[in-house]
Amino acid sequence: MKNIRNFSIIAHIDHGKSTLADRFIQYCGGLEMREMSEQVLDSMDIEKERGITIKAQTAALSYKARDGQVYHLNLIDTPGHVDFSYEVSRSLSACEGALLVVDASQGVEAQTVANCYTAIELGVEVVPVLNKIDLPAAEPERVSQEIEDIIGIEAIDAVRASAKSGIGIEDILETVVQKIPAPKGDADAPLKALIIDSWFDNYVGVVMLVRLVDGAVKPKDKIKFMATGAEHLVEQVGVFTPKSVQRSELRAGEVGFIIAGIKELKSAKVGDTITQVARPAAEALPGFKEVQSQVFAGLYPVESHDYDNLRDALEKLQLNDASLKFEPEVSQALGFGFRCGFLGLLHLEIVQERLEREFDMDLITTAPTVVYELLLKDGTVIEVENPSKLPDPSKIEEIREPIITSTILVPQDYVGAVMTLCNQKRGVQVNMQYMGRQVMLTYDLPMNEVVMDFFDKLKSTSRGYASLDYEFKCFQASDLVKLDVMVNGEKVDALSLIVHRQNAIYRGRELVSKMRELIPRQMFDIAVQAAIGNNIIARETVKALRKNVLAKCYGGDITRKKKLLEKQKAGKRRMKQVGNVEIPQEAFLAILQVSDK
């Protein structure tokens, strides 16, 4: 046990954590040369393409240290993106130490700070590493100072390395062995294991990635999940060296996998505790929480007969992604589809891309919304995540919107622009701190505004230098109204938005003029209107196409021409009564592009 080291790597996107993991695996001989590929631990195509890590992965490596002993290192790769912060906290609570990898040319970023604080709160030993020191732009001195100023851990003796060219890999492994403590735990106590991650395999069912805290587990044991109370029989246990290798048992302090013939991912929840039925543990490990969806959007198949295929596809994705929630929904404009809940915008994009790529679906996605809390006149509190489900305004006492606390790290030159942006988005400044060349701004922002386009705007006002991290704070009452879009006098439910009253008129005008460009011209005039309740606040008309009915009249009496024109007018009127308007996919995306002024 004293020779086991469990550690994970904390880093911002693109600071080189997956490459570093590759080097460790290569150095310790976890895979043979022919099996090496770039980003071994990122198993999904979409992870490799976007260069991000979504699911946690592990590698059990053997390392012969300079003191001649062989150490068993368990590397747990964590996702770095803010949407997946719960997965990060699970991965970290399974470790005793974490490598804080910082790009020596870019310095500290917001998500690094957030994940690092999570690690420190969980009592994990943080070891700083400066990566990419072979870049001409690298400034290791400045960056180590930055780590000390911003995060407050000693970084003078931070290991300097370059994962790409393989410099300093051995130094990092030595530091891991010396600085990170060995796991504490009792191999003879009742079994306690933390589920770090779980995914679905077509052959064996659900595979659970676990960290054993106490006790041991071997095949044929009966295990029990403490959050759900479900019981299963263990079929096999083992470790990943990234390849899966079966073992006869897993003991306290180790990280490995358990397969127990489970059919549904819902029963193996990330962060839950596994124990034995015969000798159950007294209490579960702390920190388990149900993942809450933050962002909602409607997904509809373009062809309505694809509805069943879409449901199958979502169910299959859910096998691998327990944080995806969905329920059936009917829209008058779009037919049958699903209302889906996501962790954040990146998660929404990834799910959409996987549906299109892996399942070949054609989808229409409505604008993302957040959950609102409504206090009704009769004193009940309900949650609404779909604008078209909002009850009649006369019944509502107040609407509360979710507020998030966001931490923005930005270079000094761009502070003004970023503060202006936050104020436009109805943000309230909480704190501002200068640290070296960076400034850390803390704002309370309405989540509704962040979902729309805040992230893109933040990147463009700061030329890509600002980085953002956020967490949910509370629900707060606010003056919100529902903005409806009407085409030809009929409400299009899929285009409804909940907006702040001060932005409503501007938003309505923008949206309507965008829609006018996107709806194809018909044989009759189409009125596109934006309304709040019964008040129309903006209107545009899509002009009719018309045939020149006078082309065949040469000369002749004016009454003849009038008769033809009147006949055409009457025909157009009749068409307008029966005509319905096809709204193209782009119109639904137009909502996303409507920004606040």
From Swiss-Prot:
Role according to the record: Required for accurate and efficient protein synthesis under certain stress conditions. May act as a fidelity factor of the translation reaction, by catalyzing a one-codon backward translocation of tRNAs on improperly translocated ribosomes. Back-translocation proceeds from a post-translocation (POST) complex to a pre-translocation (PRE) complex, thus giving elongation factor G a second chance to translocate the tRNAs correctly. Binds to ribosomes in a GTP-dependent manner.
Bilayer topology: Peripheral membrane protein
UniProtKB keywords: Cell inner membrane, Cell membrane, GTP-binding, Hydrolase, Membrane, Nucleotide-binding, Protein biosynthesis
Protein family: Belongs to the TRAFAC class translation factor GTPase superfamily. Classic translation factor GTPase family. LepA subfamily.
EC number: 3.6.5.n1
A Gene Ontology cellular-component term: plasma membrane
Superkingdom, taxonomy of origin: Bacteria
Name of the featured protein: Elongation factor 4
Leading EC class: hydrolase
Keyword Cell inner membrane: yes
Originating species: Laribacter hongkongensis (strain HLHK9)
Residues noted as binding GTP in the record, renumbered to the chain: 14-19, 131-134
Localization per record: Cell inner membrane
HAMAP family in the cross-refs: LepA
tr-type G domain span: 2-184
Signal peptide per UniProt: none
Main location: membrane
Recorded coiled-coil stretches: none
